[in-house]
């Protein structure tokens, strides 16, 4: 998912503006395991595509990029942190895939909740999801299980359209 394949100017997408119409779209921070394992890359790509189809602007599209590791190898830890936190603070909501445990994903979820940004956590039924997610009573947090790609897409679209 290279930048050249994305529609519209990067600046407009970050501001949530739809290609000259001026219409605002929800800005979503997509969160998924990177260093903890990329075995769900296909799921992250489906999540990205589903959000785009629903009219959302995915600010952290790099999570679904198969070339992410190569691109991030050229960045410092500080640059990665600044990019991700900068995008998170511009987001209307965070959607996290939490099947694969990730300290970074947990950190992003916590930062979003502290900022009162709505969070949707998604996981497969067999996942051993942290009690810090499953037991969290924060009203801004929603945790859902999905059994297949169709269910995943339905949950994501429903959440995005409700923003």
Curated annotation (Swiss-Prot):
The keyword Hydrolase applies. Keywords: Glycosidase, Hydrolase, Nucleotide metabolism. Pfam families: Nuc_deoxyrib_tr (PF05014). InterPro entries: 2'-dNMP_N-hydrolase, DNPH1, Nucleoside_deoxyribTrfase. It catalyses: a pyrimidine 2'-deoxyribonucleoside 5'-phosphate + H2O = a pyrimidine nucleobase + 2-deoxy-D-ribose 5-phosphate; a purine 2'-deoxyribonucleoside 5'-phosphate + H2O = a purine nucleobase + 2-deoxy-D-ribose 5-phosphate. It is an enzyme of class 3 (hydrolase). Its EC number is 3.2.2.-. It comes from the Archaea. The keyword Transferase does not apply. GO terms for molecular function: 5-hydroxymethyl-dUMP N-hydrolase activity. Substrate binds at residues 29-35, 44, 62, 108, 130-132. GO terms for biological process: deoxyribonucleoside monophosphate catabolic process; nucleoside metabolic process; nucleotide metabolic process. Monomer and homodimer. Catalyzes the cleavage of the N-glycosidic bond of deoxyribonucleoside 5'-monophosphates to yield deoxyribose 5-phosphate and a purine or pyrimidine base. Belongs to the 2'-deoxynucleoside 5'-phosphate N-hydrolase 1 family. This is Putative 2'-deoxynucleoside 5'-phosphate N-hydrolase 1. It comes from Methanosarcina acetivorans (strain ATCC 35395 / DSM 2834 / JCM 12185 / C2A).
């Amino acid at each position: 998912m290279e930048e050249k394949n994305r529609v519209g100017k990067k600046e407009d997408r970050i501001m949530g503006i739809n290609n000259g119409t001026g219409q605002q779209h929800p800005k979503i921070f997509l969160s998924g395991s990177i260093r903890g394992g990329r075995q769900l890359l296909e799921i992250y790509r489906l999540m990205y595509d589903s959000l785009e189809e629903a009219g959302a602007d995915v600010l952290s599209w790099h999570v679904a990029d198969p070339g992410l590791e190569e691109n991030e190898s050229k960045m410092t830890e500080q640059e990665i942190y600044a990019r991700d936190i900068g995008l998170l603070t511009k987001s209307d909501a965070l959607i996290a895939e939490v099947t694969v445990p990730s300290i970074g994903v947990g950190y992003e979820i916590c930062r979003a909740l502290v900022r009162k940004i709505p969070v949707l956590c998604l996981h497969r039924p067999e996942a051993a999801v942290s009690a810090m997610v499953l037991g969290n009573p924060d009203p801004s947090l929603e945790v859902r299980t999905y059994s297949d790609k169709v269910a995943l897409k339905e949950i994501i679209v429903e959440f995005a359209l409700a923003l």
